[in-house]
Amino acid sequence: MARSEPRPLSGKVVAITGAARGIGLATARACAARGMKVAIGDLDLGEAQRAAESVPGAVALALDVTDRQSFEAYLDAAEAQLGPVDVLVNNAGIMQLGPFVDEDEATAIRQVDINVHGVLHGMKLVLPRFKARGAGHLVNIASMAGKTGIPGGATYSGTKFFVYGVSEAVRGELLDTAIEVSCVMPVPVNTELAAGLQRGRGSTFVEPEDVAAEIVSVLEHPRFDVPVPRSIGRLVQVTGVLPRGAREAIGRAFKADKVLAGADSNARRAYELRAAHSEPGLEPGKQAKQLSDGSSD
């Protein structure tokens, strides 16, 4: 069957969370290169503004995904400056590693707040806008750790299982509409989030630009499952039919069970500290007001 013509992206508005760096920034650049209008959202407004300088026509907006009021203000500000949002990329997320039994409650809660509640806020706020206009595309960034539980990152892995599951369920609810839902599942990406990870025999890492390219591809040719790289998706499908013992033996043979569990804590220290202390700099109400009226003091 011939592949359908790509959907035009030029002039479309895309809102990207956690877009000041990493996958988010690479996606912002890739979308802008297709003529899309980009709203860069990030908790660190200064970094977002610096990022926007490298993305033609982009606007930088403060965003705390854990705060529904802040998220709504972000979408309102994006639409006020660029027009109705056609695409939301729920990219913001953190990964803090270590043995599950040693993980403190604050670390677990922080990951759930950002990786789960942040995605839920975005979905619940943008989908009514899409439904009112009769179209839209929701892209949620999960992980291959959301398809296969990875030791050393149990809470992170659990949050990404949630992202995949809620995305799949909501897609089912929207099948009779023109609203698209996609779930992107990369292997470890060469960003600060992957600092210190073990690179075992057969392990695969990708670049932020690889993920961004797949996101643009899925906007042009909508589909739900978006593994990055695509080959890993086929591998997971094949190994998924094997008995659990066989799957685990293969994982140990390729040291997949050490990718997160064997991470170098010293190499990860700077990232882990930033992730642990990435608290919003403004009270939610004040932040929302500033986002709405464009003020910054």
Which residues fall in each region the model found?
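The beta1-alpha1 cofactor-binding region of Rossmann-like NAD(H)/NADP(H)-dependent oxidoreductases
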Residues: L45, L63-A73, E105
